[in-house]
Amino acid sequence: MITIDALRICDGERTLLDGMTMHLPANAVHGIAGEGRSALLQALYGLVVPDAGRITLGGHPLRRCDVGFAEAEPRFWPGLTVRDCLDLAVRYNPGSNPAAMLRRLPVPLDAEAAALPGAERKRLALVLLLLNPKRVLLLDEPFRGLDVESAFMLRQLILQLGSEGRTVLVAARLAELDGICDDFYVLGGGGVRGRYEHYEFARAVREAAASGIAEK
């Protein structure tokens, strides 16, 4: 169980999350839509230090070594090729199979990772994340910039992760979460505006539209 207790995150004078509390069961795919979703994932990974509140996994502070994170705008060290990045991933994750992932999310192996177009950089970041055996995986705007085929393949991979018992958080537009999550949350006004089971998508859309955050 990931427990987020009274989390507050500010960006200058803006309050992104204001005393937000969530309880996310382990071994499930959780969708996060609405305002402040990227800030939440960044706090879970430790890129953002909350102004207040705490985050725990199984009753203990959530550690970065337990978490894998794919940023919305992935960045790579200059000079490293795609092959170099994959070799490093395999070195740290023996037994992982990048070839199987690349068949679903293809990236040119000899290209410089940092110089890839945006969609290919995103595919590489997702491949590297999905090779990661960590207990919790965070995907921030994973569908942004992907072509239709890649988005379909990614949806299948997320479903596979769920069937394997991984704990996955997907931050995306509400429409992109339908059919891939065990449950999903709509954020707004600094907190959770609604929590929905996977079969309640239509109700989530109606309520999000009524509050003006359906497309955020």
Which role fits each region the language model picked out?
Residues 151-164:
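Helical segment within the ABC ATPase nucleotide-binding domain
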Residues 73, 78-94:
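Q-loop/switch helix immediately C-terminal to the Walker
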Residues 191-213:
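Conserved beta-strand-loop-alpha-helix hinge in the C-terminal portion
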Residues 137-141:
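Catalytic Walker B motif of ABC-type/P-loop ATPase nucleotide-binding domains
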Residues 2, 17-19:
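Conserved structural motif at the start of ABC-family nucleotide-binding domains
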Residues 50-65:
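Conserved ABC transporter NBD signature motif
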Residues 125-126:
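Hydrophobic anchor residue at the start of the ABC signature
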Residues 45:
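Helix-to-loop junction immediately C-terminal to a conserved catalytic motif
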